[in-house]
Structures are given as structure tokens and as C-alpha cells.
């Protein structure tokens, strides 16, 4: 049986399991077992036990639960409200006015939380009722929030960058550095779109309110100091070489706890809720990574990635042709799976293919998250589903669900 046929069989089995509602981690491990038993002579039980044990104590992966915990703590603190208060006085004079708060707020919060879901829930809980109350169109408010929340995929310390680094055995610090410029480019593009849209149709944007004096705006900016300290402590310690990503994650947890308590409104009960939520999320991601690692090892025993990479090399495809095919593949896959699942599921197959045509893994990272804007759209559906579950108050929850379908929100973001 040829490798393409084997790969197609395994892909059909995987999608059948996912369509049947099986957990992603269980589906990945089950496909790996099928591949080992049916298409190789390797001892499946020994390979599975060795893989699970070998990948369960990764030092790089230790940063993952810490960054998740930091995001959960910030989600329950008032730092997002303070951030809105500090940004709003400076952005009122720009075309689009306070809609830029969604863009810059998501960018800043993504830089301290590392999670797109936490960014969407936190900034949305604060900005959506405020902007709608001031007369901004709901479509633009939710569209800018949905699009800007995906900045958490790229702006360090992104959780998915850590997963990508572990899956591809790349330096997480280098991945963080590689995500800075593309992330800033996206921030500028999102803000530019808001400005152009407001310039083309001024009736969409409410009239500017009372202009605050310069000293009053400076005074309001003091609320940005805690966020700036957190960014400086986490990102600055990594880029200056004072700490590894794991050490910086631990520092970020300590700083986020201190700042959450010092700004008020944060209690020990909320800290316990953050710990439990971070534990559940970390365990879920850990199981997915173990299943993906087992699948990668199983694919190695079958020889499919190696032979597929050689086949791609013999076809003489240009890098752009391969990227076009991968873009369509990721758009389809992103409609069914979240970002972490897509990364761990496709790495063992896609990485040898892109390396076979001479594409650097770090460049592939940027293409994966920014080089194809349409690639990001399928992620809006699961992300907005999380946003609607977690946003408060309930009145806003009902209003968004009743008036904006996921398809409408995706169209607005697009």
C-alpha cells in the first residue's frame, strides 16, 4: 500500500473520530495506535509508554501552565478596566476614536496574558458595553474585538508559540522574538482599517466628546503603569537574557498576583478560581500534546513524513505553490479545530514538507499566523464561542447572542 493511501486512511480515521465527538487527545493517540499496529512492526505499547514518559517532563513546556495562570489571574483583575481608562483619553482624536481601544487593548493584554481567549473575554467584557453605550455600531465593535483578539496567537508570550516551539523543537525565545514585528504589523493594519473605514463613512462613528486637557490625559495614563510593569517584567526579562521563558512565566505569575491585589477587586477566592481554571486548561493542552507526540513518533515509524517530504521535493513545487495548498488545507482544518490542536496535529506532516522546499521553520511560523490573513478567520468561531460563554454581564451575553450570529461576527471581522 502506497504512502498517500495510508495517509488518507489515517486522515479519514482521525476525522471520523473527531466528528464522533472523541476528545482530540484520544483521537490523536488512537490514530497513532492504528498506524503502528497496521502499518509498522514496532511494539505499539512500548512506543506509546516511552513517548508519553519522554514528553511529560519537558522543561520548555513548564512555561505553558504558568502563562495560562497569569492570563487567568489578569482575566479576573481590574487591570483591563484601568487599561481602558488610560488609553481612551489619547485615542478620542483619531479617526475611529475609541474603536482603537479594542485594537490596542487586545494587543497590550495579549502581551501580558499570552491567550487569545482570555484577551477576547477580558477586553470584550469591558469594552463592548462601554462602546455600545456611547453609540458605536455593534458590528464594528464586535468585529474589531474578534479580529484583534487573535493577536494573542502571535504577540509574545503567546501560549500557542510555546506549543509550536515544543512540537517543532525550536527555541521558544527565538519564536517570541520572531513574533514581535508581525504582531506590531497586524496592530497597525487593524488600526489602519478602522481609521480608513471611519474616514470613508464618518456617520458610523459618534461625535467626539469633551476634549480633556493634556494634564488630565497624563493623569489618566497612570493607570497604564501596572500593565507596563508587567510587560517589562515578562517580555523584558526574556529579551535581555536575564531569564528563560519558563523563568519569565514564573515572574509574570508573581507580578500579576501582586498587581491584581494592589489594584483592588481581587480576592483569594478569585485566585483559587484562577488556579482551578488554569489547571483544567493546562491538563487539556498537556493531553493533546502527548497525543500529538505519540502520533509524530508513529508517523516516523511508518515513514510517511519522510517519504512525503521526498515526494514533494521530487515534484519541484515552488514554495509559493506549496504555501497556497497549505493555506486551503489550514482554512478547512481551522473550521473544526482550535489553534493548538491544528498546530500539534499538522506539525509532523507539514514541517518536513516546508523544509523540503527550503522554508525556514521560523518563517513558516509567521506564515502560519500572519502570512495568510484568511488562515485566521476560522479561529474566530471557537474563540467567539468562548467569549460569549465567559463575558459578563448576562444582559450583554443575551444581546450578542440574539443579534449577532457567529457567521455575522466572522464577516464583520473579515
Where are these regions (language model features)?
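Alpha-helical transmembrane segments of multi-pass membrane transport proteins
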Residues: 1-414
Amino acid at each position: 500500500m502506497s504512502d498517500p493511501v495510508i495517509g488518507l486512511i489515517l486522515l479519514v480515521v482521525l476525522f471520523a473520530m473527531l466528528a464522533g465527538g472523541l476528545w482530540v487527545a484520544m483521537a490523536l493517540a488512537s490514530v497513532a495506535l492504528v498506524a503502528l499496529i497496521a502499518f509498522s512492526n514496532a511494539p505499539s505499547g512500548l512506543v506509546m509508554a516511552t513517548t508519553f514518559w519522554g514528553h511529560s517532563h519537558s522543561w520548555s513546556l513548564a512555561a505553558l501552565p504558568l502563562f495560562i495562570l497569569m492570563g487567568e489571574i489578569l482575566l479576573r483583575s481590574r487591570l483591563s478596566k484601568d487599561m481602558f481608562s488610560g488609553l481612551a483619553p489619547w485615542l478620542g482624536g483619531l479617526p475611529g476614536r475609541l474603536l482603537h481601544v479594542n485594537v490596542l487593548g487586545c494587543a497590550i493584554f495579549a502581551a501580558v496574558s499570552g491567550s487569545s481567549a482570555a484577551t477576547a473575554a477580558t477586553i470584550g467584557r469591558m469594552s463592548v458595553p462601554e462602546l455600545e453605550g456611547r453609540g458605536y455600531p455593534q458590528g464594528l465593535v464586535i468585529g474589531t474585538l474578534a479580529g484583534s483578539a487573535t493577536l494573542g496567537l502571535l504577540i509574545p508570550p503567546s501560549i500557542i508559540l510555546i506549543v509550536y516551539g515544543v512540537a517543532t523543537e525550536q527555541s521558544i525565545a527565538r519564536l517570541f522574538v520572531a513574533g514581535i514585528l508581525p504582531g506590531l504589523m497586524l496592530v497597525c493594519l487593524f488600526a489602519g482599517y478602522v481609521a480608513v473605514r471611519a474616514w470613508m463613512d464618518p456617520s458610523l462613528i459618534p461625535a467626539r466628546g469633551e476634549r480633556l486637557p493634556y494634564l488630565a490625559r497624563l493623569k489618566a495614563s497612570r493607570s497604564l503603569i501596572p500593565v507596563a510593569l508587567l510587560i517589562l517584567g515578562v517580555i523584558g526579562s526574556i529579551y535581555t537574557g536575564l531569564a528563560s521563558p519558563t523563568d519569565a512565566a514564573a515572574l509574570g505569575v508573581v507580578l500579576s498576583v501582586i498587581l491584581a491585589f494592589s489594584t483592588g477587586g481581587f480576592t483569594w477566592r478569585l485566585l483559587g478560581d484562577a488556579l482551578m481554571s488554569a489547571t483544567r486548561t493546562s491538563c487539556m493542552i498537556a493531553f493533546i500534546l502527548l497525543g500529538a507526540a505519540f502520533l509524530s513518533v508513529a508517523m516516523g515509524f511508518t515513514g510517511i513524513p519522510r517519504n512525503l517530504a521526498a515526494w514533494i521535493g521530487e515534484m519541484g513545487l515552488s514554495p509559493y505553490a506549496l504555501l497556497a495548498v497549505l493555506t486551503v488545507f489550514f482554512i478547512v482544518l481551522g473550521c473544526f479545530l482550535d489553534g493548538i490542536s491544528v498546530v500539534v496535529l499538522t506539525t509532523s506532516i507539514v514541517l518536513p514538507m516546508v523544509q523540503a522546499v527550503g522554508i525556514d521553520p521560523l518563517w513558516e511560523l509567521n506564515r502560519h499566523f500572519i502570512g495568510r490573513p484568511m488562515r485566521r478567520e476560522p479561529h474566530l468561531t471557537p474563540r467567539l464561542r468562548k467569549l460569549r460563554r465567559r463575558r459578563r454581564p448576562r444582559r450583554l451575553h443575551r444581546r450578542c447572542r440574539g443579534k449577532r450570529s457567529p457567521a455575522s461576527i466572522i464577516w464583520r471581522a473579515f
